[in-house]
């Protein structure tokens, strides 16, 4: 997948799910299921409920995403 096809949205983590998955509510009121990106796992960045995050999604499946950044 080319990098240009990625959509980025800010959101808030609402729920922690099993297997390092998170339920994220985007600013446009959609709820998706997201997992943390490999660099966040490698650097052991913790994501908790209530954290503001940046989520990458593909235009092909708008129900799943990847958390790439935890906002301050």
Curated annotation (Swiss-Prot):
CDD domains: S1_IF1. Keywords: Cytoplasm, Initiation factor, Protein biosynthesis, RNA-binding, rRNA-binding. Residues 1-72 form the S1-like domain. InterPro entries: NA-bd_OB-fold, RNA-binding_domain_S1_IF1, S1_domain, TIF_IF1. One of its GO terms (cellular component) is cytosol. Pfam families: eIF-1a. It comes from the Bacteria. GO terms for molecular function: ribosome binding; rRNA binding; translation initiation factor activity. It is found in: Cytoplasm. Component of the 30S ribosomal translation pre-initiation complex which assembles on the 30S ribosome in the order IF-2 and IF-3, IF-1 and N-formylmethionyl-tRNA(fMet); mRNA recruitment can occur at any time during PIC assembly. PANTHER family: TRANSLATION INITIATION FACTOR IF-1, CHLOROPLASTIC. Belongs to the IF-1 family. HAMAP family: IF_1. One of the essential components for the initiation of protein synthesis. Stabilizes the binding of IF-2 and IF-3 on the 30S subunit to which N-formylmethionyl-tRNA(fMet) subsequently binds. Helps modulate mRNA selection, yielding the 30S pre-initiation complex (PIC). Upon addition of the 50S ribosomal subunit IF-1, IF-2 and IF-3 are released leaving the mature 70S translation initiation complex. This is Translation initiation factor IF-1. It comes from Brucella canis (strain ATCC 23365 / NCTC 10854 / RM-666).
């Amino acid at each position: 997948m080319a990098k240009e096809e990625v959509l980025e949205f800010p959101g808030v983590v609402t729920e922690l799910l099993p297997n390092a998955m998170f339920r994220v509510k985007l600013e446009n009121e959609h709820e998706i299921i997201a997992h943390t990106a490999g660099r966040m796992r490698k650097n052991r960045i913790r994501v908790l409920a209530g954290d503001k995050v940046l989520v990458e999604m593909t235009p092909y499946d708008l129900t799943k995403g990847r958390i790439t950044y935890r906002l301050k």
